[in-house]
């Protein structure tokens, strides 16, 4: 497998790993991270800065779903009891094209062991000035219509002063099994309709009715990141662990976690053979003095 692919211009530097189709880390050219720093040691996708979610995102309770007259099964793909985050993040991707400003990766799931999906996924990561753009496409290569979902799992640095704005209309509580519970109004403590600090407690929730825009500010490094996501990503997953306050995740998703189990295949995108689902999001980095 090739080594990390480095993307670089006069504003940003980014490393990409074919393993997991993951972004390893990302920083400004003067060394300020806007994605989680990787650190030392061998590559581990769970220590990376971003990985793709395909053909579904998050967990599938019960590891199965019904579609038509068929029952389709998933197999757990980690030590957890449920199939989680799809196949792409655990797979080796092929570098199809590469330059200093972009890389195209592809992954073929022709003989699935853990899921019933047969597909081709393509990820295109590019730099343009102070903007990183990530695009993910999945094409159904199976013999029948199947539910597909896509998303990204980016990890951002978290400092004591980190502030977030990401307006949404509602959220899902969390229940046992790290699964969504009930859809309710967003509590004041997690209302990010205006720029505010992350609460000093654990968050692991899906926010729906998202505008596709978010802003992160790191006062300590005088840096800001503006996120824009395609309309297919109408919700985001926010994960901020209580025991490790060095990072948080804000991941665009095309469907609610556990939607296959709760709402059925129609809650995802039903792709006929040959059909494609695609979506992109971007991160634009800028200097920020507003909290100095």
Which stretches of residues belong to each language-model region?
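Acidic-aromatic substrate-binding/catalytic surfaces of carbohydrate-active enzymes
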Residues: 15-71, 77
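Acidic, contiguous internal or C-terminal segments within carbohydrate-active enzymes
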Residues: 7, 107-148, 152-156
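Glycine-rich active-site loops that engage anionic ligands at enzyme catalytic sites
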Residues: 218-257
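Short, Gly/Pro- and small/polar-rich lid/capping loops
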Residues: 1-10
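Extended, loop-rich substrate-binding clefts of extracytoplasmic carbohydrate-active enzymes
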Residues: 70, 75-129
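Short, hydrophobic/aromatic-enriched beta-strand segments in well-ordered soluble domains
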Residues: 16, 105-107, 125, 216, ...
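Active-site/ligand-binding surface loops and adjacent short beta/alpha elements
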Residues: 74, 146-147, 155-230
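Short Pro-Gly-centered flexible turn/kink motifs
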Residues: 65-73, 136, 269-287
């Amino acid at each position: 497998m090739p080594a990390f692919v480095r993307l670089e211009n006069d504003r940003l530097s980014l490393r990409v790993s074919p393993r997991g189709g993951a972004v390893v880390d990302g920083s400004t050219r003067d060394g300020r991270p806007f994605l989680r720093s990787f650190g030392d040691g061998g590559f581990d996708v769970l220590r990376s800065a971003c990985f793709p979610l395909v053909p579904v995102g998050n967990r599938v309770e019960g590891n199965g779903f019904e579609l038509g007259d068929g029952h389709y099964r998933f197999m757990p793909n980690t030590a957890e009891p449920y199939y989680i985050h799809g196949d792409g993040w655990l797979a080796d991707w092929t570098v199809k094209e590469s330059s200093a400003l972009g890389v195209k990766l592809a992954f073929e799931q022709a003989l699935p062991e853990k899921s019933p999906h047969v597909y081709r996924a393509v990820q295109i990561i590019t730099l343009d000035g102070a903007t990183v753009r990530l695009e993910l496409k999945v094409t159904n290569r199976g013999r029948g219509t199947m539910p597909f979902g896509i998303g990204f799992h980016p990890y951002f640095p978290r400092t004591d002063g980190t502030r977030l704005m990401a307006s949404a209309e509602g959220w899902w509580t969390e229940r046992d099994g790290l699964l969504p519970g009930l859809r309710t109004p967003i509590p004041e403590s997690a209302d990010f309709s205006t720029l505010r600090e992350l609460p000093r407690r654990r968050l692991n929730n899906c926010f729906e009715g998202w505008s596709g825009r978010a802003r992160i500010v790191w006062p300590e490094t005088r840096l800001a990141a503006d996120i824009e996501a395609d309309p297919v990503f109408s919700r985001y997953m926010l994960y901020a662990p209580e025991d490790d306050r060095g990072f948080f995740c804000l991941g665009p998703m095309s469907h609610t976690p556990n939607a296959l189990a709760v709402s059925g295949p129609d809650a995802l995108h039903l792709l006929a053979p040959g059909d494609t689902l695609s979506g992109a999001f971007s991160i634009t980095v800028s200097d920020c003095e507003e909290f100095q």
